[in-house]
A protein has these predicted regions:
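A structured beta-alpha segment of the ubiquitous adenosine-cofactor-binding alpha/beta core
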Residues: 26, 36, 40-45
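Short glycine-enriched, charge-decorated loop/helix-capping segments at active-site entrances
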Residues: 4, 106-111, 206-207
Length: 257
C-alpha cells in the first residue's frame, strides 16, 4: 500500500505494544526438533512465542505442469479471455491464473476470492460449450488491522512509476461522522490520478468500516475511466449517526489540480 498508510499502521502497532522488525538482509530461523526456537535478525536473536508465515502467494501449478499446460513467468496457468489454457479442452480460473489489470492493461496476479468466483462462472460456461469472456480487473482489497480497516484500490504511486504512467496524488483526513457523534473518528484517504487526463488510477484508505464503501466507489470510477474531479461533484448522503456532513471523497476531489 501507500507509504503514508504504512507509517500509520506502524504507529497502530506501536500503540498496541507490537514491535515490528523489517528490512533485514539476513533472516535465519533457528529450529529444534522441527520447531522454531529463535530468529536471527542480522545477528540479533529474538525468541518469539508464535511464528506466522505470511510470505505471499504463488500459484499452485503442480497439476497444470503434469498436464503439460503452458505457464506464465509468474508460474500461473496461461489463459486467454475465455479462460482457455494451451490445451483447448481445459479451462482454468481462480488463484492459479493471471488477470488483466484494468489500469495498466497488463497481466497481473492477485488471488482474490471475488475475482475467482466471477471467473469460475465464465470457465464453467465455456467448458460446457459457451462463449463467455472475462473482463479486466480493478484490484480492490480490504484487510483488518487491529481496530481499523485498510483498503487498496487500483494501483499505487509505486506501481504507476513501474508502468511509466504519469501521475499526481492528493491526500486528506476527515471524520467519518460529525464530531459530536460518539463513534466519530478520523479516516485517511489518498487518490492517485493520471497527471494528464486526471483519470483515477488508484486509492488507499485507512479507517473504519466506511472505507469499504469508499473503495467500491473508486473501483467503479476506475472502470468508468472517470476523472478524479467527479469526486467533488457526487451527491453523498448525510445523516449524523451514519455518514459525515462533508464526505472524505468530496474533500479529495476538490484537491485535484
Amino acid at each position: 500500500t501507500e507509504p503514508e498508510i504504512r507509517v500509520m499502521i506502524l504507529e497502530l502497532l506501536k500503540k498496541e505494544g507490537i514491535i515490528f522488525h523489517g528490512a533485514y538482509d539476513n533472516l535465519l530461523l533457528n529450529t529444534e526438533n522441527g520447531f522454531i526456537k529463535s530468529i536471527n535478525l542480522d545477528g540479533r536473536i529474538i525468541e518469539p512465542e508464535l511464528v506466522i508465515s505470511a510470505v505471499g502467494f504463488t500459484p499452485n501449478n503442480i497439476l497444470a505442469e503434469k498436464a503439460g499446460l503452458r505457464l506464465t513467468p509468474r508460474g500461473a496457468v496461461k489463459v486467454d479471455r475465455s479462460l482457455k489454457t494451451s490445451d483447448p479442452s481445459i479451462f482454468a480460473c481462480g488463484d492459479n491464473i493471471e488477470i488483466i489489470n484494468e489500469v495498466t492493461k497488463r497481466t497481473d496476479y492477485f488471488p482474490v476470492a471475488t475475482v475467482a468466483h466471477d471467473f469460475a462462472h465464465v470457465a464453467g460456461e465455456n467448458a460446457a460449450g459457451g462463449s463467455a469472456v472475462v473482463n479486466t480487473v480493478v484490484k480492490n482489497i480490504a484487510v483488518k488491522i487491529l481496530n481499523k480497516f485498510q483498503v487498496s484500490v487500483g494501483i499505487t504511486e509505486a506501481e504507476a512509476l513501474q508502468n511509466s504512467i504519469p501521475f499526481k496524488s492528493i491526500q486528506a483526513s476527515a471524520p467519518n461522522l460529525v464530531k459530536v457523534m460518539p463513534d466519530s473518528r478520523q479516516v485517511f484517504g489518498k487518490i492517485v490520478y493520471h497527471a494528464l487526463n486526471k483519470n483515477i488510477l488508484g486509492a488507499a484508505f485507512l479507517g473504519g468500516k466506511e472505507v469499504s464503501g469508499y473503495g467500491d466507489i473508486i473501483s467503479a470510477l476506475i472502470k468508468l475511466k472517470s476523472s478524479a474531479h467527479i469526486l467533488a461533484d457526487l451527491n453523498y448522503n448525510y445523516t449524523p449517526p451514519l455518514s459525515p456532513f462533508i464526505n472524505l471523497l468530496s474533500i479529495l476531489g476538490r484537491k485535484v489540480k
